[in-house]
């Protein structure tokens, strides 16, 4: 909001992302499972309705009591606040997810900037992804909501190696609030690409109440 009036901001992020996911499933009837019991955020009504309209059903999945079903076309791990269990526990959730991915499974993973998840971080590292501590602050005012540097308007990635963003309306801004940065690197067997990028002026701040920053 501005002091001289108001401005409307359209958030089409979920529909843009689900449109890309729809391309991966070829429009056939599919089932997407979202994990539970790690403090994850439940899928929003917008996401559920959009996927349903594209013939994709959402189902909850507790990895502590169930294997990943064979009909799982997409596994969603949505901002867990507690870590996945590893091989030092009764159930090895990390290996379950790892095996699912190694067999060609697809995953949609969002992170929580405030909680430590070393097991999940180790799994991400195998695919060229590392979380940056803190939350992203945008230093370029054209890439953030006016007066709110934590509300980002990132640029779409070029996605040279994939077609994940083909057909996405790039003139529609995706707004991300209190987002966490990721370092993306290529590993021997995996090509990792950024779908959304901040400006060069953005940085991570670990303590939002201090002036300390991390480039």
Q: Which residues does each PLM region occupy?
A:
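Short, surface-exposed patches at the edges or C-terminal ends of soluble domains, predominantly
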Residues: 1-215
């Amino acid at each position: 909001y501005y002091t001289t009036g108001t401005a409307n901001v359209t958030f089409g992020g979920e529909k843009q992302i689900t449109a890309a996911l729809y391309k991966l499933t070829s429009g056939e009837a599919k089932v997407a499972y979202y994990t539970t019991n790690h403090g994850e955020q439940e899928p929003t009504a917008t996401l559920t309705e959009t996927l349903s309209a594209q013939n994709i059903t959402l189902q909850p999945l507790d990895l502590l009591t169930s294997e990943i079903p064979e009909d799982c076309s997409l596994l969603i791990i949505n901002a867990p606040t507690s870590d996945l269990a590893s091989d030092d526990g009764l159930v090895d959730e990390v290996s379950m997810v790892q095996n699912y991915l190694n067999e060609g499974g697809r995953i949609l993973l969002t992170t929580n900037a405030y909680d430590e998840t070393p097991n999940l971080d180790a799994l991400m590292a195998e695919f060229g992804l590392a979380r940056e501590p803190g939350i992203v602050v945008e230093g370029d005012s054209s890439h953030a909501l006016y007066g709110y540097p934590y509300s980002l308007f990132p640029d779409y990635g070029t996605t040279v190696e994939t077609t994940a963003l083909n057909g996405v309306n790039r003139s529609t801004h995706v707004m991300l609030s209190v987002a966490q940065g990721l370092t993306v690197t290529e590993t021997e067997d995996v090509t990792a690409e950024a779908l959304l990028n901040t400006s060069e002026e953005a940085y991570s701040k670990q303590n939002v109440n201090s002036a300390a920053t991390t480039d």
